[in-house]
C-alpha cells in the first residue's frame, strides 16, 4: 500500500488542550494537501474547520465525552447534538468505561444508542465509539465490541490516546474477529510511522487516528 493510499485512512488529529486557531488552520491545510480522510478536533473548533474545509472531501470529526468517558449521558447527548449542528460529519464518543467494568451493559448500550439515534437524524453522519482497550481484558473488549455493534454505531475505536497505551495489532485482530464486516474499526494511539499504520490496516482497521499523519505519509 502506497503512502498516498494510506492517507485516505487517516483522521488527522489535534486534540491537545493548547490548540490554537493557527494550529487548527495548519491541520486543515495539511489535510487538504495530503487528502486525509478527516481532521479530528475538539468541539470548539468544529465550525472553524467546517469553514476552512468547505467544498473539499475532507470530513470534520470531533469528540464526545472525551477523553474519560465519564460525563453524564445527558451531557454526551448535548455534545453530540451541538457537534452535528455545528457541522461535524463524524463523532468519536467515549463509552462510560467504569459502567462497562461494573457490568452495566444496558447503560453503555443506551448511551451509544442515543448518540447513534441523533446521528441518524442527519444525513451521512458517522459515529465511532471508543472503548479504551488498554483498560479492558480481552473478554471485556469482545463484550464492548458487541455492544457497539448492537447499538448501531459505524465504527468501534481502540483508544483515546490519553490512557495507558494505544492501539495494538493483537487488539485489532480480536476486534475484527468479533465485528467481522458488520462495522468498521478505527485504530488510534501510538501510531506514528508508516509501518505502524500499515500494520493496523493489515490487521483490519479502516481508519487510523493519529497526530503524525504528515510524518507517516512523508517518510522516505
Curated annotation (Swiss-Prot):
Reactions catalysed according to its record: 2-deoxy-D-ribose 5-phosphate = D-glyceraldehyde 3-phosphate + acetaldehyde
Top-level taxonomic group: Bacteria
Pathway as given in its UniProt record: Carbohydrate degradation; 2-deoxy-D-ribose 1-phosphate degradation; D-glyceraldehyde 3-phosphate and acetaldehyde from 2-deoxy-alpha-D-ribose 1-phosphate: step 2/2
UniProt keyword annotation of Lyase present: yes
E.C. designation(s): 4.1.2.4
Cellular component per GO, a single term: cytoplasm
Example GO molecular function: deoxyribose-phosphate aldolase activity
Subcellular localization, as worded in the UniProt entry: Cytoplasm
Keywords linked to the UniProt accession: Cytoplasm, Lyase, Schiff base
InterPro entries: Aldolase_TIM (IPR013785), DeoC (IPR011343), DeoC/FbaB/LacD_aldolase (IPR002915), DeoC_typeI (IPR028581)
CDD domains: DeoC
Pfam families the UniProt entry points to: DeoC
GO biological process: 2-deoxyribose 1-phosphate catabolic process; carbohydrate catabolic process; deoxyribonucleotide catabolic process
Active site: 92 (proton donor/acceptor), 157 (schiff-base intermediate with acetaldehyde), 186 (proton donor/acceptor)
Function recorded in the entry: Catalyzes a reversible aldol reaction between acetaldehyde and D-glyceraldehyde 3-phosphate to generate 2-deoxy-D-ribose 5-phosphate.
Similarity comment: Belongs to the DeoC/FbaB aldolase family. DeoC type 1 subfamily.
Classification via PANTHER family: DEOXYRIBOSE-PHOSPHATE ALDOLASE
HAMAP family assigned to the protein according to its UniProt record, in alphabetical order: DeoC_type1
Record-given protein name: Deoxyribose-phosphate aldolase
Gene: deoC
Amino acid at each position: 500500500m502506497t503512502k498516498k493510499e494510506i492517507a485516505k485512512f487517516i483522521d488527522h488529529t489535534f486534540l491537545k488542550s493548547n490548540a490554537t486557531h493557527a494550529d487548527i488552520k495548519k491541520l486543515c491545510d495539511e489535510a487538504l494537501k495530503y487528502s486525509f480522510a478527516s481532521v479530528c478536533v475538539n468541539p470548539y473548533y468544529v465550525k472553524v474547520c467546517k469553514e476552512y474545509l468547505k467544498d473539499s472531501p475532507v470530513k470534520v470529526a470531533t469528540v464526545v465525552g472525551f477523553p474519560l468517558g465519564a460525563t453524564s449521558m445527558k451531557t454526551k447527548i448535548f455534545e453530540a447534538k451541538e457537534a452535528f449542528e455545528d457541522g461535524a460529519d463524524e463523532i468519536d464518543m467515549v463509552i462510560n468505561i467504569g459502567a462497562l467494568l461494573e457490568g452495566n451493559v444496558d447503560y453503555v448500550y443506551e448511551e451509544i444508542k442515543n448518540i447513534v439515534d441523533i446521528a441518524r437524524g442527519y444525513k451521512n453522519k458517522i459515529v465511532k465509539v471508543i472503548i479504551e482497550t488498554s483498560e479492558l481484558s480481552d473478554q471485556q473488549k469482545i463484550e464492548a465490541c458487541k455492544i457497539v455493534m448492537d447499538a448501531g454505531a459505524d465504527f468501534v475505536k481502540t483508544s483515546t490516546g490519553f490512557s495507558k497505551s494505544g492501539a495494538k495489532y493483537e487488539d485489532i485482530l480480536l476486534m475484527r474477529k468479533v465485528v467481522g464486516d458488520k462495522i468498521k474499526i478505527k485504530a488510534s494511539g501510538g501510531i506514528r510511522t508508516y509501518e505502524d499504520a500499515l500494520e493496523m490496516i493489515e490487521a483490519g482497521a479502516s481508519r487510523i487516528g493519529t497526530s503524525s499523519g504528515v510524518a507517516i505519509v512523508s517518510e522516505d
